[in-house]
């Protein structure tokens, strides 16, 4: 079996049928998600920081709070438009504030709490209470003041929270156990600096909150994507924002199961094709290349959202995807068993055959992969590339 040999159904015929439809499907009719105006960004940012700063017994709404920060950055009207464009007929409920009636802040003002639709007031109050209690204890224990970047009010606290969301973003396509395991393992590595600043952060529980949110409120995926793309299109940004964009683009694109190899795709077309490919199961073979070429990059995302395990891509007519195929081959076990999991033998053989054919036709561009020396050596050994012929592939 080879990738070239996979016979695919005639998608052009299917597209012709679909184009004849004069109707659209309304989803989430009557659903009422919370939308927070930009004027409350400071309050939402602080709540995000409080979630990170202290240990809490309940993190169920952590992801929702993170998405409300997204709402404040995009703006309430734009947020509602994004939700509408995603096909969701939802009725937004604006977030408000209310006076707690007890206790005052450092400026002597009455404490104002956020009233987020769908989030119990008691939950918000408990998070705030625990964070203030932890802050008071830390201030007492420290000889000097707590650095600003270690406080709940740190400006990049919401971005750190959303970084965990980006790490879990593609995981609803896998099992909860595997998805969380992968995301948490990677978070402990890439969020190392944040963990030093916020040592009480509970990454597994926050990741679980995002997993549940993206699974239950699918329309939030579109909002998260638009935020990531908007942030990534900006030429400036903090260190945390740059980290988020890096994580997001890999999550939006290659996903984590492709190892580092999947990150080589430079366009959203390539990236989405790569992700769908690595989620492949031969029982559900679907050709998406023509779909992407016809409908643009969003078709790849649509395909992933509607059928996460959509099937193995046939890339026989897509020579520009050589690097992506090699990345898939790597993630699926050709360069070694991935995390001890037995690969799909048919898929293994197909990807191996295609990778070898690319090597033989000098189409593998190692210089574009950004490999470590160890990865490059593994690839060269697998494909039997000798020193004399090495330059043919760079």
Swiss-Prot record:
InterPro entries: Pneumo_ncap. It holds the Pfam family Pneumo_ncap. It comes from the Viruses. The keyword Oxidoreductase does not apply. GO terms for cellular component: helical viral capsid; host cell cytoplasm; ribonucleoprotein complex; viral nucleocapsid. Residues 136-153 have a biased composition (Polar residues). One of its GO terms (molecular function) is RNA binding. Encapsidates the viral RNA genome by forming a left-handed helical nucleocapsid that protects the RNA from nucleases. RNA replication depends on the availability of soluble nucleoprotein. The encapsidated genomic RNA is termed the NC and serves as template for transcription and replication. Belongs to the paramyxoviruses nucleocapsid family. Homomultimerizes to form the nucleocapsid. Binds to viral genomic RNA. Interacts with the phosphoprotein P. When in a monomeric RNA-free form, interacts with the phosphoprotein (via N-terminus). Interacts with protein M2-1; this interaction allows the association of nucleocapsid with the matrix protein. This is Nucleoprotein. The gene is N.
């Amino acid at each position: 079996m080879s990738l070239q040999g996979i016979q695919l159904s005639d998608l052009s015929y299917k597209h012709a049928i679909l184009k004849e439809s004069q109707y659209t499907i309304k989803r989430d009719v009557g659903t009422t998600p919370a939308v927070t105006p930009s004027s409350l960004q400071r309050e939402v940012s602080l709540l995000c920081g409080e979630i990170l700063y202290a240990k809490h017994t309940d993190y169920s709404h952590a992801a929702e709070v993170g998405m409300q920060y997204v709402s404040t950055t995009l703006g309430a009207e734009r947020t509602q438009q994004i939700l509408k464009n995603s096909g969701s007929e939802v009725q937004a409920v604006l977030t408000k504030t209310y006076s707690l009636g007890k206790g005052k802040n450092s400026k002597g003002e009455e404490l104002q709490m956020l009233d987020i639709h769908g989030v119990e007031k008691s939950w918000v109050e408990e998070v705030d209470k625990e964070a203030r209690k932890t802050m008071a204890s830390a201030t007492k224990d420290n000889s000097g003041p707590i650095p600003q970047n270690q406080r709940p009010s740190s400006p990049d606290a919401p971005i750190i929270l959303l970084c965990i969301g980006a790490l879990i973003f593609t995981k609803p396509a896998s099992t909860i156990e595997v998805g969380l395991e992968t995301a948490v393992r990677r978070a402990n590595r890439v969020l190392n600096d944040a963990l030093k600043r916020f040592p009480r952060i509970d990454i597994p529980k926050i990741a679980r909150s995002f997993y549940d949110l993206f699974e239950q409120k699918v329309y939030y995926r579109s909002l998260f994507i638009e935020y990531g793309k908007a942030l990534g299109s900006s030429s400036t940004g903090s260190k945390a924002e740059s980290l988020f964009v890096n994580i997001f683009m890999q999550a939006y694109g290659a996903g984590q199961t492709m190892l580092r190899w999947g990150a080589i795709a430079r366009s959203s077309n390539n990236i989405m094709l790569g992700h769908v490919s690595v989620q492949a199961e031969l029982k559900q073979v679907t050709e998406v290349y023509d779909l992407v070429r016809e409908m643009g990059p969003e078709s790849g995302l649509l395909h992933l959202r509607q059928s996460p395990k959509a099937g193995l891509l046939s890339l026989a007519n897509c020579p520009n995807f050589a690097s992506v195929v090699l990345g898939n081959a790597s993630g699926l076990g050709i360069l070694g068993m991935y995390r001890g999991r037995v690969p799909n033998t048919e898929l293994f053989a197909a990807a191996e055959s295609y990778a070898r054919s690319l090597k033989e036709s000098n189409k593998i561009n190692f210089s574009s992969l950004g490999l470590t020396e160890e990865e490059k050596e593994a690839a060269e050994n697998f494909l039997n590339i000798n020193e004399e012929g090495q330059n043919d592939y760079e």
